[in-house]
Amino acid sequence: MSEIKKIATRDSYGNTLVELGKEHDNLVVLDAYLAGATKTGVFKKEFPERHIDCGIAEGNMAGIAAGLATCGKVPFMSSFAMFAAGRAFEQVRNSIGYPHLNVKIGATHAGISVGE
């Protein structure tokens, strides 16, 4: 039986985005000025042309992700859970949910720890 290695959830998220990026040329990662905290910076280092820093503007990030999805990209939005759910709710519902667009939302830091 192999040994199980513990890894922080956010580290796993960043590493998995890189693995998926190697397999899928249409994968794009967006973050809200949180590349270090959400570990999307790992993806940015590997694929700088497929990473978009949207600044502290989760609602706008949802709109950008929706636009990219309509053009055949598979966007991964990344932010703190509080802001991904709270600040971007209407844009996610109206621009992504209603038209059933293929957008993924990675919401980190949802609890009382950072997932170390």
Locate predicted features.
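Thiamine diphosphate
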Residues: 1-116
